[in-house]
Amino acid sequence: MRNKAHGFPHRISFDGEPDRAKHASKRANGTINTKPQERMHQANPDQ
């Protein structure tokens, strides 16, 4: 087989536990962007 390394493990592995909430992306103030529509309405109160 050309251009393929033999005996190397696969780079992507889905084994193990899923990501935990403590690793979830958050803003600096600790909030998560779960309701963008609500945030947009707060930013534009005249509409």
Curated annotation (Swiss-Prot):
Annotated spans, Disordered: 1-47
Cysteines joined through disulfide linkages: none
Entry's Gene Ontology cellular component terms: endospore-forming forespore
Domain of life: Bacteria
Keyword tags: Sporulation
Record-level GO BP terms: asexual sporulation; sporulation resulting in formation of a cellular spore
Induction (free text): Expressed only in the forespore compartment of sporulating cells.
A Pfam family recorded for this sequence: SspK
Subcellular location per the Swiss-Prot or TrEMBL entry: Spore core
Family: Belongs to the SspK family.
Protein name per the record: Small, acid-soluble spore protein K
Annotated organism of origin: Halalkalibacterium halodurans (strain ATCC BAA-125 / DSM 18197 / FERM 7344 / JCM 9153 / C-125)
Lineage: Bacteria, Bacillati, Bacillota, Bacilli, Bacillales
